[in-house]
Regions:
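Short alpha-helix
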Residues: 213-231
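A short SAM/SAH-binding and catalytic strip from SAM-dependent methyltransferases
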Residues: 96-112
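Conserved class I S-adenosyl-L-methionine
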Residues: 1-36, 129-171, 185
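A short acidic, Gly/Pro-enriched loop at the edge of an enzyme's catalytic core
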Residues: 86-98
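A short glycine-rich, Lys/Arg-flanked "PGG" loop and its adjoining helix->strand segment in the class I
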Residues: 114-129
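Core SAM-dependent methyltransferase catalytic element
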Residues: 229-258
Length: 258
């Protein structure tokens, strides 16, 4: 997996919504985070849109130095640490709010989701908040995606629909299989670009998935709720209105009282 994320970092400018947060997502996250009036904010990853807008003193944690080097811009009250989200390099009860964008999908479901909830509960102060934009599964087949192709509005929406359509019943899909399924579904990339107006370099960015051992997971919203409890208690869920917004809800949770 070590080569997948450096490639992703180098091609960040080619990634768009819903894989990358749009203004609606940032507005939702900022509203939810502000409920905590945080002094100390943990950003899971180095998503530039989150780091630029979240309140409080920010510490960003990412496992990949290449992601930090490519995307993180230091500033007063802003620092980045190399570390694992399942073993955060932070003291107990040191964070008021943790916010992340889509990162749960890198975890193996359900075990790593449970471990993640426990680790967030460890670093959060009492009544601390967690704000997570999720990528959640809704059932459809590749034939459904093929039939919907004329109405799909962006390449990244297409890519995510393919990924969810081919994941296993255990909620796991190998990244390289997403590219293979795309090539089988759309054998003529030039024709796709001409018909849709999508930039060819955006379409070809899927080639970073070739031979990648990384895996993604897309559980349903209810499945996520179940595995994050009892460490984290749901406060609210907000669903945006853009394409695939129903698969990209923002879930706000509070550390359970002990």
């Amino acid at each position: 997996m070590s080569d997948h994320w450096p490639k992703h970092a180098r091609g960040w400018s080619l990634v768009g919504p819903p894989l990358r947060p749009c203004a609606d997502d940032i507005e939702i996250a900022l509203h939810e985070v502000s409920l905590a009036s945080p002094r100390d904010t943990l950003v899971l990853g180095v998503t530039p849109e989150l780091i630029a807008t979240m309140p409080g003193a920010i510490v960003a944690v990412d496992r990949e130095p290449a992601m930090i080097d490519a995307l993180f811009e230091p500033a007063p009250d802003r620092r980045a640490l190399v570390g694992e989200w399942l073993a955060l390099p932070l003291p107990d009860a040191s964070i008021d709010v943790a916010v992340g964008d889509g990162g749960c999908s890198v975890f193996a479901f359900p075990g790593e989701y449970r471990a993640f909830a426990a680790e967030l509960a460890r670093v959060l102060r009492p009544d601390g908040l967690v704000v997570l934009r999720l990528f959640t599964f809704q059932p459809e087949t590749l034939d459904d995606v093929r039939a919907a192709l004329p109405s799909i509005g962006s390449f990244d929406a297409l890519k995510w629909r393919i990924a969810m359509a081919i994941q296993s019943p255990e909620r796991s899909v190998q990244v390289s299989a997403i590219r293979d399924a795309f090539d089988a579904l759309v054998p003529d990339r030039a024709a796709l670009a001409a018909r849709t107006g999508w930039r060819r370099e955006v379409i070809d960015h899927i080639d970073i998935y070739r031979d990648s051992p990384a895996r993604y997971s897309f559980p349903t919203l209810d499945e996520v709720r179940e595995v994050l409890a009892p460490e984290l208690v749901e406060v609210s869920v907000t669903t945006p209105r853009y394409e695939l917004g129903d698969r990209c809800p923002t879930l706000t949770l509070r550390r359970a009282r002990r």
